Amino acid sequence: MLIEFTKMHGLGNDFMVIDLVTQRLDLTKDLVQLLGDRHLGIGFDQLLVVEPPMRPDVDFSYRIFNTDGTEVEQCGNGARCFARFVQARKLSFKQRLRVETASGIISLTTDHYGWVEVDMGKPKFEPSEIPFTPRATTKIQNAYHLDVNGTPVQLYVANMGNPHAVIKVDDVLDADVESLGRAIESHPAFPERVNVGFMQVMNQRHIRLRVYERGVGETQACGTGACAAVAIGIREGWLDEGEDVRAQLYGGSMVIKWQPGYSVMMTGPTAFVYEGVFSPDGLMAQAGIKPNPEI
């Protein structure tokens, strides 16, 4: 059995996208890990899965998996690619889609130039909504001072469908994204782990950002990370509310807009890279892995 897939990216954040509306595949953790291996499989930051809707008021179900095989709640760059993919596959001809994710329903609107606007919902800042358990931390206004390997690190938290910690830095190029990101990602204060953003405010409508993604590592871009960083920046008064804010990442720039009390709106480009097929049984057999139960 061969399964068709499409490789896409949003600002360098790369995805393998599979249509499970017209195809059948039992996704296991082992298979996701193999597919995500850039040497033995296809390779991606996240696997995006299009499934039939589970409820009548949405168009599709949208599932996201990291390379370690874990299913996650949300992916903003992936959402943009999801919208372009279902149109290219002729699964829908709607310009505006409602899709269900593990964290709730989001709306996707595609323009004639291939850019997609995503209604990411309202940001959440309460520790219980992240989730974040700051028992051993010091809080000054909205900032938390978290002990990381004996060193206090000032950070802010937000949930954009998935958990984010954001650190304001003077220069993102000097930020210790790899080691500090890894340490905070798995810190006991974040029971479900956390994505870690390093934000440099250039002016009130421009930030530079690097993100260490939970279960992946640093990526070229992170849509939910950009939304979290801009929402925090607006909440703290560093950025203009209700205006287009340019979030500049390694892979390129996207536009984030947030008026407190309303949804965060994210707009950015997508790109198709190639299409292909793979054999699930062949991959598993090559790796010497016996079939496992579904995720």
UniProtKB/Swiss-Prot annotation:
GO BP terms, alphabetized: lysine biosynthetic process via diaminopimelate
Family: Belongs to the diaminopimelate epimerase family.
Matching PROSITE patterns: DAP_EPIMERASE
Organism: Psychrobacter arcticus (strain DSM 17307 / VKM B-2377 / 273-4)
Catalytic activity as recorded in UniProt: (2S,6S)-2,6-diaminopimelate = meso-2,6-diaminopimelate
Keyword Ubl conjugation among UniProt keywords: no
Site residues by UniProt (Could be important to modulate the pK values of the two catalytic cysteine residues): 164, 213
HAMAP family, alphabetized: DAP_epimerase
This protein's name: Diaminopimelate epimerase
Pathway in which the depicted protein is active: Amino-acid biosynthesis; L-lysine biosynthesis via DAP pathway; DL-2,6-diaminopimelate from LL-2,6-diaminopimelate: step 1/1
Pfam families: DAP_epimerase
Gene from which this protein is expressed: dapF
